[in-house]
């Protein structure tokens, strides 16, 4: 029903609270399947968690990784313990093992990914500056980009959200957007404070 009500052409979509980040999945479903894209997500959480009752804000990345038009998913800025050993069993492993999904994190112990054969799907850094520099150095300019930003990736010095927050500053998002200039085919922003 929602699909039929959406315009055929739209710019960046603002989805409100981070509780609704899974609406990105609906927007991705609207993209043509014959054109491969890279999905770049800025989020303090992996949003790749197991959830037995369908899709929600913490599980949508798994479903997005399965879309035929999605060549690769990069989740940048993860600082949440959701990807630590304590929560390893909660993560969907298949997109990580298949190297369809890469976690780009700061200051989280993710050695367990090596133990399951997914070490190459994890990029660990000690700062947001290092993370963004490394990501931009490997960014594939030939693939169109769908960009999804959850404001919880930003430091509390920049913005307040309802979720635990990351270390990114405005300069990190600006550098990413500048690097993707001309390649972005869709975008959404979530993470407003819930009322």
Feature-to-residue mapping (PLM):
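Conserved alpha-helical scaffold segments that buttress catalytic/binding sites
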Residues: 1-195
């Amino acid at each position: 029903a929602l699909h039929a009500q959406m315009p055929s052409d739209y710019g960046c979509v603002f989805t409100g609270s981070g509780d609704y980040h899974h609406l990105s999945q609906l927007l991705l479903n609207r993209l043509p399947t014959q054109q491969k894209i890279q999905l770049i997500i800025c989020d303090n959480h992996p949003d790749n968690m197991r959830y037995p009752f369908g899709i929600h804000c913490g599980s949508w990345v798994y479903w997005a990784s399965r879309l035929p038009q999605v060549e690769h998913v990069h989740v940048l800025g993860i600082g949440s313990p959701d990807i630590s050993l304590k929560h390893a069993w909660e993560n969907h492993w298949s997109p990580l093992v298949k190297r369809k999904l890469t976690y780009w994190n700061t200051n989280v112990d993710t050695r367990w990914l090596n133990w399951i054969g997914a070490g190459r799907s994890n990029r660990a850094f000690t700062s947001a500056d290092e993370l963004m520099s490394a990501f931009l150095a490997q960014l594939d300019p030939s693939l169109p980009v769908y960009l999804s930003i959850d404001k919880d990736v930003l430091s509390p010095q920049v913005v307040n959200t309802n979720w635990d927050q990351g270390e990114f500053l405005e300069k990190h998002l600006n550098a990413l957007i500048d690097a993707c200039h001309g390649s972005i085919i869709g975008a959404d922003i979530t993470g407003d404070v819930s009322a």
